[in-house]
């Protein structure tokens, strides 16, 4: 099995009622859905909870190119590869959020391939 595509889909929804946060009152909330598709048409779904468009850019421009063609079942190896190649960006924030969304999608693929729940 090989990874053939990774899609990062920004999500946005209205909050009723608005909620308070450190940034003030929020009427909208966003996130990022991560879909990883394999050559066997297995699609894993993950979520990168914050960052929206910026996290999408990290996935599209930085992480996706290093993962296309890889075996999605080698989760630890792929995680280490992403972690090592993003070292210069630090170990917090948007990059780790992007890695997390991909990691969740890879585990979803593993569960589906094994026909087991996560």
Question: Which stretches of residues belong to each language-model region?
Answer:
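Structured beta-strand/loop patches that form or line metal/cofactor-binding pockets in enzymes
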Residues: 1-40, 45, 49
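Metal- or metallocofactor-binding catalytic centers and their adjacent structured scaffolds
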Residues: 37-113
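Short, intrinsically disordered, charge-balanced linker/junction segments flanking boundaries
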Residues: 114-118
């Amino acid at each position: 099995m090989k990874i053939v595509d990774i899609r990062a889909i920004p999500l946005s929804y209205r909050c009723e009622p608005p909620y308070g946060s450190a940034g003030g009152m929020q009427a909208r909330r966003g996130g990022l859905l991560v879909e990883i598709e394999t050559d066997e048409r297995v699609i894993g779904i993950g979520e990168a909870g914050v960052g929206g468009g910026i996290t999408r850019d990290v996935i599209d421009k930085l992480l996706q190119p290093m993962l296309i063609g890889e075996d999605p079942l080698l989760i630890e190896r792929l995680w280490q590869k992403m972690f090592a190649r993003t070292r210069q960006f630090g170990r917090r924030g948007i990059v780790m959020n992007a890695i997390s969304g991909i990691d969740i999608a890879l585990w979803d693929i593993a569960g589906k391939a094994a026909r087991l729940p996560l």
